[in-house]
Amino acid sequence: MKVLKFGGTSVGTVESILSVKKIVEAIDEPVIVVVSALGGITDKLLQTSMMAAQGDVAYEKEFSAIITRHLDVIEGVISDLEMRRSVQRRAMGLLDELGNILRGVFLINDLSVKTSDTIVSYGERLSSLIVSHVINDAQLFDSRKFIKTVKQFNKHVVDFEQTNQLIRETFNPLPKVSLVPGFISTSRDNGEITNLGRGGSDYTASILATALDASVLEIWTDVDGFMTADPRVINSAYVIDRLSFTEAMELCNFGAKVIYPPTIYPVYHKNIPIRIRNTFNPDAPGTYISREKEKYDGKALIKGISSINDTCLITVQGL
């Protein structure tokens, strides 16, 4: 069994969603597919909610653009008329809920963390609804029912004991294709919507892979894998074939935005490898990440270089 995660760029357009369909349907074993919101939608939801909280009536125009974006994608990816109308109705039901929440934010000029978390959750709820009707035989699941968080030091963290138990119960038996919205979770204590942070869809996929002992976690994105350096700075940079978990973590923590760093922890402890793949170049082998370190072959002592712009690192030490 594999877990595949597709990011916002991978589900951002009609063409990319159809590429996802082709990739998933070519796999001949059970898969869990985790999707992010359509590319740019999370930022759009945050921007729209902030405008509403500030009493800016122009939020309605931004919200209208969000509605149009989703309806256009549905129109482009679902050819069956009856199914398309059904998905449009369900999507409009979610969008109507979202519109009512935004209207409330506008009227009281206030946006709480709880309300913001609820608003951004609609991105993944909508994208997963759409993609689940594009991939043949896909069964849609609601991650709010099995990804549970607790609050520690004013931050939501995953309750792995309850989450793992719920995941195993939910995916028993395991369908041929399971479709799961990433990023979204709920509080263990009160059931309120929470989230796993920006990039949290990677983390969702890692949690699922760990709980279900997947053979591999595949992160499908818009690059061929980890690069030896930022290709925008070093034009001779190339894809790194293999990395250890430690090496990948170091690169991620210092600027390589290929994987959300917390993603690595769960699969590391279960020794489940990660493979970075490119949705737009699916034949590329990508980067394979595991516990095993490659032996030095005399060619390159340094695997890769990453950096964080406009940041100073200060080390203070004493005798």
Model-based region annotation:
Residues 38-39, 223-225, 274, 278-283, ...:
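Glycine-rich beta-alpha junction loops
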Residues 1-264:
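Nucleotide/pyrophosphate-binding catalytic subdomain
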